[in-house]
Amino acid sequence: IATLAIYTAPLQLKYDGRIGGRLDADLVLPMIKLYERTNTRCEAGWAATQEILLRRADKTLFESDEVIRLLVEHSGGHPRELLHLLRLCCELAPGNSIDHATAQAAIGRLAADYRRWLTPEDYALLCEIDRTPEHGGNDERAQRLLHRLALMEYNDGSWRRSHPVIRTLEGYVRAAAQ
């Protein structure tokens, strides 16, 4: 039987030395770039990310275009995070539509997942990388943040930025103020 199989695995496995050489060629899908390194909006990335969202949920499900924009923005351009936010919205919505309050609650819930494991040192490094995106950070801490999606990589790794939901957390705000 001729078949084509696609396996997906967490990004951490790609960098795990214990399985090196045991897998066939791998393909790591990039984040969809919502912003350029200069922080100008990348319209093509926004359109692509919004299209992913609207292929999963009808536009009439959302109270407004602003709710769609909010979810796209806080996904950081990562399709899995976008769909995670959509799932949280569906779980949290009090009725049959997703309003601004529901989207904010979903963002807060996703942010809480990160807050549980991020340390003050992690926040400081994320702020440093956000101030200087080409800094990148290739030490063990930066690699851990990258593997756990607290740090997002764009343009084949040429620059990085913290996950947008992390920027809503008090720990990040405190570190950014220092």
Over which residues does each language-model region extend?
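The catalytic "switch" region of P-loop NTPases
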Residues: 1-68
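C-terminal alpha-helical "lid" subdomain
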Residues: 59-74, 79-178
